[in-house]
Amino acid sequence: MPKRVLQGTVVSDKNDKTVVVRVERRFAHPLLKKTVRRSKRYKAHDENNMCKVGDVVLIQETRPISKDKCWVVVNENQAQ
């Protein structure tokens, strides 16, 4: 099964080797027929502490690294 890859914005880098990434998705509301934005926060592993708040990054699903962390930062420069 292929690993999921998501694009999001770093909202926190206070933890060591961990960043919190907010991923927004857009969908049509079934009743209102209106485009709605929803966001979700993922904890991702950042081995070298390269990411800063506001960076647009790609995260990829991986094995569980800790209780809450099962994503890893793939690339912080190419995500646009």
Curated annotation (Swiss-Prot):
Alphabetically ordered keywords of this record: Ribonucleoprotein, Ribosomal protein, RNA-binding, rRNA-binding
A GO CC annotation given for this chain: cytosolic small ribosomal subunit
GO biological process assignments: translation
Entry keyword annotation includes rRNA-binding: yes
Presence of the UniProt keyword Membrane in the record: no
InterPro entries in the record: NA-bd_OB-fold (IPR012340), Ribosomal_uS17 (IPR000266), Ribosomal_uS17_bact/chlr (IPR019984), Ribosomal_uS17_CS (IPR019979)
Gene Ontology molecular-function annotations: rRNA binding; structural constituent of ribosome
Subunit comment: Part of the 30S ribosomal subunit.
Function: One of the primary rRNA binding proteins, it binds specifically to the 5'-end of 16S ribosomal RNA.
Family, similarity comment: Belongs to the universal ribosomal protein uS17 family.
UniProt protein name: Small ribosomal subunit protein uS17
